[in-house]
């Protein structure tokens, strides 16, 4: 068994310097960072607004944000596939099997996480400082900025949780990205598709091997 495991490991380390490996890692980070940024831009203010604002349907939105923490990736991927396919309502945009579709898919998965965690992070500061902010006549936007600054550590944790969701995603990006070599192939899809039924070390063969004499 030792001999069987040695070869894939050697191949993996040798592949670290190949152009395809660098391209896969670069695309993975680009897609995940972009999706996380989009999710943060939407999720942070939404999570804060759910804490300080009172409006009809607020409790339902909080419930949905928490429920979508466990949103099945395959459901998101399938829904986006149907929307972006040629016969779908957004087929004219030609987004299917592109990095842009992967960003959208990952952002949809990360947004509920950042929203729900931000809402929880700001609840306590709002109870403590909300009265003072109202007395000072702070607007809702100003209050949101202040609360996000006060709970910045928890907010950073929420964003990191969103990034962890995006960088580890497989099913959704596989459906909408297609795992096209040199175009939409990222780290997770490359490893999973090359893994041979759970054999230890087989996932290393997902990476390109350097040319041999």
In which residue ranges do the predicted regions lie?
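Membrane-water interface segments at the C-terminal ends of transmembrane alpha-helices
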Residues: 2-5, 14-123, 150-170, 205-213
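Short juxtamembrane loops and helix-capping segments at transmembrane helix boundaries
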Residues: 11, 92-96, 185-190
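Interhelical loop and adjacent transmembrane-helix boundary motif
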Residues: 15-20, 175-212
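Juxtamembrane helix-boundary/capping and inter-helix hinge elements in multi-pass membrane proteins
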Residues: 19, 53-58, 123-128, 138-140, ...
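Hydrophobic side chains within alpha-helical segments
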Residues: 109, 131, 172-174
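Short cytoplasmic-facing helical segments at TM-TM junctions of multi-pass membrane proteins
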Residues: 117-155, 188, 203
């Amino acid at each position: 068994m030792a001999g069987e495991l040695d070869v894939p490991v050697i191949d993996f380390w040798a592949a670290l310097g190949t152009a395809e490996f660098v391209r896969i890692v670069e695309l993975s980070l680009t897609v995940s960072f972009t999706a996380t940024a989009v999710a943060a831009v939407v999720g942070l203010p939404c999570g804060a607004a759910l804490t300080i604002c009172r409006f009809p349907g607020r409790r339902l939105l909080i419930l949905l944000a928490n429920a979508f923490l466990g949103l099945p990736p395959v459901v998101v991927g399938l829904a986006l596939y149907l929307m972006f396919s040629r016969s779908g309502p957004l087929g004219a945009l030609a987004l299917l099997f592109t990095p842009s579709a992967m960003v959208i898919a990952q952002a949809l998965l990360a947004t509920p996480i950042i929203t729900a965690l931000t809402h929880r992070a700001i609840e306590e500061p709002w109870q403590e400082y909300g009265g003072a902010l109202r007395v000072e006549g702070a607007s809702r936007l100003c209050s949101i900025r202040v609360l996000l600054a006060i709970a910045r550590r928890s907010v950073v944790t929420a964003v990191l949780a969103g990034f962890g969701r995006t960088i580890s995603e497989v099913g959704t990006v596989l459906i909408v990205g297609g795992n096209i070599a040199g175009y939409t192939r990222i780290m997770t899809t490359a490893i999973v598709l090359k893994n041979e039924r759970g054999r230890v070390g087989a996932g290393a063969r997902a990476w390109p091997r350097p040319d041999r004499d």
